[in-house]
Amino acid sequence: MLRINRISNLRTFGQRFFSTEQQDVVVIGGGPGGYVAGIKAGQLGMKVTVVEKRGKLGGTCLNVGCIPSKALLNASHLYEEATTKMSKYGVKCSGVELDLGAMMQYKDKSVSGLTSGIEGLFKKNKVKYDKGFGKITGPNTVEVTLNDGSVKTIETKNIVIATGSEVTSLPNVNIDEESIISSTGALALKSVPKKLIVIGGGVIGLELGSVWSRLGSETTVVEFTNRIAAGADGEVAKKFQKSLEKQHMKFHLETKVTSVVKKSDGKVTVTVEQVGAGGFTGTLEADAVLVSVGRRPNTSGLGLESVGIPTDKAGRVEVGDHFNTKVPSIFAIGDAIRGPMLAHKAEEEGIAIIEQIHNGGGHVNYGAIPSIIYTHPEVAWVGKTEEELQKEGIQYNIGRFPFVANSRAKTNDDVEGFVKFLAAKDSDRVLGAHIMGTNAGELIGECVLAMEYGASCEDIARTCHGHPTLSEAVKEAAMDAYDKPIHM
């Protein structure tokens, strides 16, 4: 028996420290960039392993970001419709109550179905999946500490860093995910806070603030700059804020948070001070505070220093035009590198880097990456804003069309917002597109396609669009940029 135990222990020791594999590509990170890279590599016949420490594929986006937030945005919107609007359509809703537990179950089911779907795609495309933490130990080696505690080394021709990002907080603000929460905590609250303060007026803060506002929270957004929705066109941002204010969300712009203190009763006091003409100085009380001030790359502990790969002050891996680091066999994509922290940007990079490794191809047009805020109304944009064009001295024409003049929007009783095109004055080529309104996130796709292929506003306007559809507003806005719209 003693001899058998010794043999067993030696075998375990060997598996723990000396297990090696040979691969063409190892992808560290199983989020949108990483899992897409893994699938693409499998499709191209490469031997590929994706290493993900979470134990679930999909990264922040699928597990505690894009997907669960959209589920709650949808559910909370339906709840608000049932309590405020359905009767005008002849649908009488009596005794409407919020079952937050059931809503959270719906959210969780949406997530679990998609994570298991990715695992199915891995099997279909022969992608190996290691649940554990990957660390670079050489130009062609990755040490994986598996979640069961065992350790193995993978030898590979190429390494792709796709480790994503994590929530960042304010100095001296401790996120406990109870009263002081990050986006992760805001997706899993056990009850609706009577008062909610959102620190940060960006995409995440506005979306999650909107969810809890619809469900009954008195929601206040505190933003350091003089506008919400950074990156959006200025005209759109102003009208968007007014829309959210009509939905009873409050805003303190040009206001700095100086302290966040949790009291013994669990409530939170937020002290703020004015940093601009429109700012506010004082204290705010809340049952919950959502800290939504940005994210930082997940690059610490990867072993980058051991192979001489530098990062910038924000922790982003420094790469060249083809995602290449200073080590020829190591690449980086997604939130780990420069650029907007967007899942779809990472997905495009995931495909591009594998094509680059495979045959030297692979390209991402960063001038045609859309941004979307999934509130109601939605806000979406691609390309240049007016402010950017003015700063660059580029002359342009503007085309606008309001949804109030769109027949489908009228029949849907949802006419808030507009479509706006910015087109080059000399060529009519689309330079930017900005939409505020229902399904803006779906409508922006046509505009992205137009920019990808260098289309003009006239090209869009002379393309037949179905009637009645919201997409006709895109056509009419394009028509307004070079001529005159028909229905306005």
UniProtKB/Swiss-Prot annotation:
Binding site for FAD: 52-61, 70, 134, 163-165, 335, 341-344
Presence of keyword Ribonucleoprotein: no
Cofactor comment text: Binds 1 FAD per subunit.
Active-site residues from the entry: 467
First and last residues of the transit peptide: 1-25
A molecular-function term among this protein's GO annotations: dihydrolipoyl dehydrogenase (NADH) activity
Annotated localization: Mitochondrion matrix
GO biological-process terms attached to the record: 2-oxoglutarate metabolic process; glycine catabolic process; isoleucine catabolic process; L-leucine catabolic process; L-serine biosynthetic process; pyruvate metabolic process; valine catabolic process
Name this polypeptide is given: Dihydrolipoyl dehydrogenase, mitochondrial
Organism: Dictyostelium discoideum (Social amoeba)
